[in-house]
């Protein structure tokens, strides 16, 4: 299947050693000029090599961001200048998850969006980052607004972390309302 305008390409996950670290960059080059937004959720060189191609969204967590810049980042305030550096290198929107410390989005319009984590009990953080990306994308496609997309991302990631398995839409929406009131 060939990607076309209206499609979205998500490049996510760590790469096995047998795959070149520029594979995500190569895949992005294939869709250049086709008006296909690309989301990159990767680490290290696999992420950095995509930045000159201006991915629509990248989603490092605070530990991955710390490793990229060889610093320790634990707060939203510390994360912001380093997320801006990734924008300066080409990323349009940078979404950084900080686990229990919340999340930050630097959007393509220069706005900084911040959120605490909604109330809930951590059960399983595995997949919470993927759920955050899915929630962000869902929110963006619903309203094209960055604040709504950001809050949906935080809600979906949190709902996943508060669940044994996949979170349901009702839980995501409940957490979304909690985030919007904050």
Predicted regions, residues:
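Conserved phosphate-binding/catalytic loop of the ribokinase/pfkB sugar-kinase fold
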Residues: 1-4
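Structural motif
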Residues: 7-8, 93
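Conserved phosphate-binding/catalytic region of the ribokinase-like
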Residues: 29-30, 48, 76-182
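Conserved beta-alpha-beta core of the PfkB/ribokinase-like small-molecule kinase fold
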Residues: 8-78
């Amino acid at each position: 299947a060939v990607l076309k305008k209206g499609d979205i390409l998500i490049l996510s996950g760590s790469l096995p050693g047998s795959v070149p670290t520029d594979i995500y960059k190569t895949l992005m080059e294939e869709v250049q000029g086709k008006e296909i937004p690309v989301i990159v959720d990767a680490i290290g060189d696999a992420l950095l090599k995509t930045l000159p191609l201006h991915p629509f969204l990248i989603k490092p967590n605070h530990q991955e961001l710390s490793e990229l810049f060889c610093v320790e980042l634990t707060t939203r305030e510390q994360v912001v200048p380093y997320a801006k550096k990734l924008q300066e290198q080409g990323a349009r929107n940078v979404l950084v998850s900080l686990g229990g410390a919340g999340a930050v989005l630097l959007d393509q319009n220069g706005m900084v969006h911040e959120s605490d984590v909604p109330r809930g009990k951590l059960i399983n953080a595995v997949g919470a980052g993927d759920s955050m990306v899915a929630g962000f994308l869902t929110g963006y496609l619903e309203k094209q607004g960055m604040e709504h997309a950001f809050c949906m991302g935080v809600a979906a990631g949190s709902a996943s972390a508060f669940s044994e398995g996949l979170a349901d839409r009702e839980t995501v929406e409940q957490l979304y309302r909690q985030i919007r009131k904050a």
